[in-house]
Amino acid sequence: MAYRKLGRTSAQRKAMLRDLTTDLIINERIETTETRAKELRSVVEKMITLGKRGDLHARRQAAAYIRNEVANAETNQDALQKLFADVATRYEDRQGGYTRIMKLGPRRGDGAPMAVIELV
């Protein structure tokens, strides 16, 4: 399996991708570097596919990866519930391609190429 190391150890990389995946599901749009966005795309697409499957095993697989964060304070809905209830139903007819990456300019501090990744 090909992947990017992103300058981190495997545990740090997995933790960062879990955080970014959870944030993208909650906010549906985040700004990050291009390489992180490209790596995040494959993880998020797999999570949405699990959400579309919707069975108990898929829910447990997604729960093992997604952080336990509150997505909506009024309804007390967490990120996993939002994935299965809102996001997965939105893409019921679509076969992949749930995210869009738009390139931005370089970051001011270090010149890293930035991008916005969002759910379509």
Swiss-Prot record:
GO terms for cellular component: cytosolic large ribosomal subunit. SUPFAM superfamilies: Prokaryotic ribosomal protein L17 (SSF64263). It comes from the Bacteria. Disulfide bonds: none annotated. The keyword NADP does not apply. GO terms for molecular function: structural constituent of ribosome. Coiled coil: none annotated. It holds the Pfam family Ribosomal_L17. Keywords: Ribonucleoprotein, Ribosomal protein. GO terms for biological process: translation. InterPro entries: Ribosomal_bL17, Ribosomal_bL17_CS, Ribosomal_bL17_sf. PANTHER family: LARGE RIBOSOMAL SUBUNIT PROTEIN BL17M (PTHR14413:SF16), RIBOSOMAL PROTEIN L17 (PTHR14413). NCBIfam families: L17. Part of the 50S ribosomal subunit. Contacts protein L32. Belongs to the bacterial ribosomal protein bL17 family. This is Large ribosomal subunit protein bL17.
